[in-house]
Amino acid sequence: MPHRKAQQHQGIGLGKISTKYSLLVLLATILLIIVATIGGKNLYFRGDYDIFFDGTNKQLLAFDEIQTTFAKTDNLAIVVAPEDGDIFTPQTLSLIQKITVDAWQVPYSSRVDSIANYQHTEAFDDDLLVEDLLYSEYELTPERISKVKSIALSEPVLKSALVSEKGDVTVVNITVQLPEMDKTAEVEEVVSSINAMIDRYQRAYPDVTFHKAGIIAMNHAFMTAAQDDSSTLVPTMLVVILVFLTIMLRSILSVIATLIVIIGSVMATMGISGWAGMFLSTATVNVPTLIMTLAVADCVHVIATMRQSMKNGFTKVQSIERSIALNFVPILITSVTTAIGFLMMNMSDSPVLRDFGNLSALGVMVACFLSVTLLPALLKLLPIHVKMEMSQDQKHFMDRLGDFVVSQRRALLPLSVAVIVVCASLIPLNKVNDESVEYFGQRNEFRQAADFMEERISGMTNISIAIKTNESQGIAAPDFLNTIGEFSSWLRDQPETDHVATLADVYKRLNKNMHGDDEAYYSLPQARELAAQYLLLYEMSLPYGLDLNNQINVDKSSIKMVLTVANLGSVELVDLENRIYQWFAEHAPQYQVVASSPSLMFAHIGETNMASMLSTLPITLVLISALLIFALRSVRLGLISLMPNIAPAVIGFGLWALISGEINLGLSVVVTLTLGIVVDDAVHFLSKYQRARREGQTAEQAVRYAFHTVGRALWITTVVLVAGFSVLAMSSFRLNADMGQLSAIVIFIALVVDFLFLPTLLMLFDKKAYLQERPSDNARLKASSTITATQS
């Protein structure tokens, strides 16, 4: 068996180096960690939504085109809600005027819209009067307030946009033009300024509730979600690790050695990412939590085997060397398979998910390296003593479980298959659904603002629709005006619609004004020259910062409409987008239409990401299966392991259909993410099973041997992994929370499958006797088998 001998010699050699030159190995690895960690100074944080999309993303390119053609729409909306439920009071209207004036002082502000400075138009003799709806020169008398209320609640531009239908909530919308030199810092600067303003007004108006909404608020929510995770989840994970390690290892010094390895793994990984020029995001900020979890599993195998060997009379040095010899290949194989799973995330359409996969894969391999170099050196130098025997109850439980599986294999196999089939049938009940607002938990300030706005005014989901005539001054053509008029009416008839901001309403109002405010003329002008003159007259009357550049391009060849809808899921939003394109294809194919928005971008990426992830699944399976076949030197065992490796994800997603039924961007990567991890259990179980078979044992005896030698270690590492991903499930950011929750479910199911389903397959399809090891090898294996009670 030259292959297996080579593997074991590598492990033995590595173990001897780490024990013979322990101080040198310790210093060398710590030096490497320090050099890597220095790269952390280059790390910076990005919290804007752009990081989720490639520069070549179709929807992002469309949105950038709209942003370039028209004024940018990055905004922060201050929602004002007086407790008395009426904004049309002198006190509240005065407050809105003050906020509107102060909002111009917000950093990077380029436009402020509110009912206070809404440019109301009306006929004045034979002229057009354009002035602020809450003109500062007018006293807020009951008559004036009544007129303002009547206009605000009837004007399509304002109703369900800047003021609620009931008149109990209003919005001051601040548009900002960020330089985008350091978008994260700029967003923080804007939000800090707004917070200071709100705090000031909150003290002066204690009976008024304020909320922050809009794109800038969403970007800030991404930032705070990541910061909250890093400040809460990582410390929580450390506590969880300390608790579980103390319970499992019953040795403070062993716990300290493990902590040094996992902290070193995290520091080195994040430092290397800094050297590579990467940045932190809401996705990658949780990489340390994953690395800690996976590194603990490696350390547990090494320490548990060493301690069991010491209990059987070997010296500490011998025990460390034996532990590395027995664990090196399983740890290497499981680390590589886990890394492959993470690396397959490079097929994701989202850059931050690719970064998450690459960093996690790097962290896994760093942890693998340190667990077979730094860890044994630490174990050699620390005065570790074994005092307690492993619980006999736990030993007996695994033996009894092995006996149960062997005796009940005829029932367990069809039962397992039935569970897999039933869960597979539930998978179609899952729907891909990304709703960016719901990425944040109910306690999140932005989520609360979004829910409040949807309940009282309108949803925060919008679609910018650019309509191009491809003709200078073409927007004044009667055919075009009639088209956008009909399209606007069609949009308002859609069940999802909350508000439509359209130039058609401006034209209708101007046409009425120019005919003495006669309601009979509230319609679109039908003469091109007249329409152009109306618009020119109106634009010349508008004050600085309140022009129509956010709706009309420079040469007046295209317009932008903004559709605001309820906070829809991705499926409904994409369906609405398709209906928009279909309307133009049927009614106005001569015009070019581009629709996009951040919400629409998130809606599309969830679907495309799931498709790309599913397309990588066969590649991942082939790579991992090939690795297993190579490691085990058995095509039969490699093929047998395929179903138990796929089953956990199948069962997990089937159960998810009952738990939630929604697949978001985070869950779209769970299959490839967990596949590499769930293979670990199969590798350890199969390696022990194969060892026994090569000693001449039957399949049934080998299954019992595998349970006896590796059962407890698999249980321990699964508990640690499930605990780690469960901590991730505590994230305030739903993408991370759902990913953690489903991953924890899949990993736990993997243990159940490897305990109940894999053994039954082995006993059914692996009955043929193995070529036995030569006597010398057999004796060596028997001698070493006594120390593998807890190793994996």
Task: List the model feature ranges, each with a label.
Residues 227-278, 347-351, 615-661, 730:
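Interfacial segments of transmembrane alpha-helices in multi-pass membrane proteins
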Residues 309-336, 693-716:
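Helix-loop junctions and hydrophobic alpha-helical segments within the transmembrane domains
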Residues 408-530:
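Juxtamembrane segments of multi-pass membrane proteins
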Residues 64, 139-252, 482-485, 536-624:
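Extracytoplasmic
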Residues 2-47, 377, 385, 389-436, ...:
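Signature of alpha-helical transmembrane segments and their immediate interfacial
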Residues 254-302, 637-687, 726, 753-756, ...:
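Hydrophobic transmembrane alpha-helices and their membrane-interface caps
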Residues 2-238:
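Membrane-proximal extracytoplasmic
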Residues 244, 332-375, 379, 625-628, ...:
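Hydrophobic, glycine/alanine-rich multi-pass transmembrane helices and their short helix-loop junctions
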